[in-house]
C-alpha cells in the first residue's frame, strides 16, 4: 500500500498538496488506484510534503511505501541518503494528536540528518504502521527513485 503527494510551489496547506484520497494498492501483478488524485486528497501524505517543504522548498514530491528490511538494504545499496525516527521517542502530547506523528517524525529525522534525505523511514509502533517515505524534487525524479528501488528489489527477491 502506498500513496503519492506533490505540493504546489510555496505550498502551506493541505489544499496545496495533490494526493490520492485512498491508498494505491498492489493486487497480484496489478496496481489498483481507487480514485483520481485531488488537492487535499490525503492529509497523511500532505503532512509529510508540507513538513519536508519547511526544510527544503525544492523537495515537493513524496511517496510512502510499506516498510521492509530488504527495501532498506536496497536503498542503502543505491546510495540513497536516509534518516529514520523511532516512534517510541515521540512526545506524548504529539502522540495523542491525530495526524501530528507524521509531522513530528519527518521533522525529527530531517533535523537528525541535517538535510532532507531521499528516504525517511520508521519501524512503526502501537497502532502505527511502519513506513518508508521516498522524497524528491518533483514527480519525475520521484518516479525515477522509486523505479530504481523497485528494479533492484525485484532482482533481490527472485
Where are these regions (language model features)?
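Conserved mixed alpha/beta catalytic, RNA-binding, or beta-rich assembly cores of soluble enzyme
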Residues: 1-158
Amino acid at each position: 500500500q502506498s500513496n503519492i503527494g506533490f505540493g504546489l510551489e510555496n505550498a502551506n496547506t493541505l489544499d496545496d498538496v495533490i494526493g490520492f484520497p485512498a491508498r494505491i494498492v498492489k493486487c497480484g501483478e496489478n496496481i489498483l488506484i481507487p480514485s483520481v488524485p485531488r488537492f487535499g486528497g490525503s492529509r497523511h501524505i500532505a503532512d509529510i510534503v508540507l513538513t519536508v517543504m519547511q526544510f527544503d522548498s525544492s523537495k515537493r514530491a513524496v511517496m510512502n511505501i510499506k516498510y521492509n528490511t530488504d527495501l532498506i538494504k536496497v536503498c542503502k545499496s543505491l546510495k540513497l541518503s536516509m534518516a529514520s525516527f523511532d516512534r517510541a521517542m515521540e512526545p506524548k502530547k504529539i502522540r495523542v494528536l491525530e495526524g501530528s506523528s507524521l509531522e513530528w517524525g519527518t521533522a525529527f529525522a530531517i533535523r537528525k540528518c541535517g538535510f532532507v534525505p531521499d528516504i525517511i523511514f520508521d519501524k512503526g509502533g502501537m497502532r502505527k504502521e511502519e513506513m518508508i517515505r521516498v522524497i524528491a524534487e518533483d514527480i519525475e525524479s520521484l518516479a525515477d527513485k522509486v523505479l530504481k528501488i523497485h528494479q533492484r528489489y525485484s532482482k533481490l527477491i527472485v
